[in-house]
């Protein structure tokens, strides 16, 4: 392929190591071109991280790449095969509307998957058109970048391109393609697919590839596959704790949406909790509350058990011993998660050291928040700045008694009051992607072609711990007329 000056200048440096795995793992895809691609948003800071030139990315040649109209040298576009437990039921899945362009190698030697989401049908489309509409792609862009700013491991969004073509859902909608960036797209469901339909040799090849790509430091230990289980558990324990600490509800925690890298992936029906309630569910398809806020840690443990099951043939030649090894590791997940969560909750309350009664102090606050329908984010924000007024919770006798116990707890630690307050302000975001704010930005962009609302929202969300005056209006919870909020997967 002849390279243009624009392509050379852009900084594309693609490899396709995934294509070296057995052919059962993927299908090589010829991209489906679109008629009139247009770049509507570009993540310039992320482009810099990837070693890409933002100006050159906006050229016609690069636009053709981001739209799936053109392949790059070093790229071998493919759709990945995987399976998954969806709401507890096993299913054969795969990239039904996405293709992996390849792996961008940055100037520092890091490797990131570049995936086009909404790029057209694949052998795994299961009758779908393989396309995506603009609203859900912009939504993933907003929330994934907000998660990154919050310090939560996540896939990210490089660009959104409109296709100039309509996609048919309940009505005709503008088509779009998102360029998703990830440490990799290896999922628990990837291992489930090979464990179900592959050989032990293919399973070993996948595990070895994963170790080399994500955990090279444990590759030489006595039982590297047990170490793989341990590392994935550690990553997910830290991730789910961070979700809980900011009130994030994923909405579709199927095993195909749990990454091996420990990144959050798939922002279809997700949302952030307003009033604190462990039973909060936003997804329109989660009618039984399987993936409710309070269930997320337990579901993560269930998913990890499915992951460990796939590796049983590699853990030990004796099946009973392999099962015991896996069970021992899975049993540690909730304890590990809880340790991360408790440390994070202490920080949200300005607590530096550990005392036995800390957990009961935290749980008592959460019970009062639930009883009084207190806003989760704003309650901790108010505690951080000692602005304890204007809500039902702060006017109760229960809270006054709790507040006295909390102040006494802070006085028992060596750190100063100012240090505690700074810890709280660094641990409690002032702004989150409030559901009504996200919807307002999407309405302006999709219905009116006005991206200024979205750009302003992205700017505010990029500094969640700044607590600046211009963020004040974005801290407001939704009006009662905007509740209850429902999300849809957008597929």
From Swiss-Prot:
- Give the protein's cofactors: Mg(2+); Mn(2+)
One Gene Ontology MF term: ATP binding
Repressor in keyword set = no
Q: InterPro entries given for it?
A: SelO (IPR003846)
Q: What class of enzyme is it?
A: transferase
Q: Which residues bind ATP?
A: 94, 96-97, 117, 129-130, 180, 187, 266
Listed PANTHER family: PROTEIN ADENYLYLTRANSFERASE SELO, MITOCHONDRIAL (PTHR12153:SF15), SELENOPROTEIN O (PTHR12153)
Q: What is this protein called?
A: Protein nucleotidyltransferase YdiU
Organism in which the protein naturally occurs: Alkaliphilus metalliredigens (strain QYMF)
Query: Source taxonomy lineage?
Result: Bacteria, Bacillati, Bacillota, Clostridia, Peptostreptococcales
Q: Quick one: which gene encodes this?
A: ydiU
